[in-house]
């Protein structure tokens, strides 16, 4: 929180509701009183593996928990792993059913405008991405943010803004903590993923400070309602 204050930064917190139940009241109240809140599902499952019914149940449960805890209507949604891209046949229908108004769950290489309204009257705020083989390099957050040099991050964000995207940074709580103990894995894949997840954490706040010299940090809700 102190680091965000030093940057003069506001943000949208997309929250996994199963996790928020485990946090103390002080943290919950700090988020409630200082940041815009969105829904990031109930338990952060890959949505492409869920049926329409399962996604419906997960979304209903997640939204009710967040609205009960924060005592406010939750109108924004972000899909875990950007996995809504594979279930667009029912994704927006379910969001509309549960009275969401905004989503930031889709990655596009090009967009005609920064906010796209679909047939269910859900306003999608896409992130810019480009392909590298079978992978999508998303601008910009998580591992991409930690391993990419600041100068390139700023260049990518400016390019996104130039091409009708809202220049967004997305980060997880673990991206900020260089002092957290590493998890122990037996298999090689787990060990490699663990090392990747810790790489570059110490650079995050310096990069955010550098970005703040070029852009003003704000929440999605404040940006939409400017």
Whereabouts are the PLM-identified features?
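Catalytic alpha-helical scaffold of carbohydrate-active enzymes acting on polysaccharides/glycoconjugates
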Residues: 1-76, 81-133, 149-226
């Amino acid at each position: 929180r102190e680091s965000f204050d030093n940057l003069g930064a506001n943000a949208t917190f997309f929250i996994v509701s199963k996790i928020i139940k485990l946090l103390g009241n002080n943290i919950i109240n700090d988020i409630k009183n200082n940041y815009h809140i969105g829904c990031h599902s109930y338990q952060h499952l890959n949505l492409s593996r869920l049926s329409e019914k399962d996604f419906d149940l997960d979304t209903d449960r997640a939204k009710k928990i967040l609205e009960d805890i924060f005592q406010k209507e939750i109108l924004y949604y972000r899909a875990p792993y950007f996995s809504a891209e594979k279930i667009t046949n029912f994704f927006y229908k379910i969001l509309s059913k549960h009275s969401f108004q905004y989503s930031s769950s889709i990655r596009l290489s090009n967009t005609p405008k920064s906010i796209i309204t679909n047939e269910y009257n859900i306003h999608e705020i896409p992130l810019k991405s480009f392909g590298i083989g079978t992978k999508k390099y998303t601008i910009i957050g998580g591992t991409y943010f930690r391993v990419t040099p600041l100068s390139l991050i700023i260049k990518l964000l400016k390019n996104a803004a130039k091409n009708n995207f809202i220049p967004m940074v997305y980060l997880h709580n673990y991206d900020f903590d260089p002092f957290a103990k590493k998890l122990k894995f037996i298999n090689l894949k787990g060990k490699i993923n663990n090392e990747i997840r810790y790489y570059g954490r110490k650079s995050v706040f310096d990069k955010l400070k550098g970005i703040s010299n070029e852009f003003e940090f704000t929440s999605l809700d404040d940006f939409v309602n400017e």
